[in-house]
Amino acid sequence: MIDITKISGIGPFIKETKQLNDFNSRDLFKIESNNKAFLVVNKNTIELRTDNKLGKLLINKYESVMESRYFGCGGLEIVSSADQLEPAELEDLIRLSYNLTKNL
């Protein structure tokens, strides 16, 4: 899994862990200034915000990318074990999600 602290262009954030049940938890990464989530890390997936056109493009391009359950339309859910996206692409998507969320 990616280390968010090593991604350039990410400002102050808060990490909250929510226990979903006895076996699963979810890490929410929120922007410190507005307390809005920009990244959700589940056991096997990550979810982030994106713009609609880029989201549709990535959903059509990769089998491991689908619409986010957390963010809904305008968000992506990526199966982390599939390794279809390069680490640099994933970092760019996380940075984009941070910047989109910062402006909400």
PLM ranges: what are they?
Residues 1-104:
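Charge-dense, helix-prone N-terminal extensions
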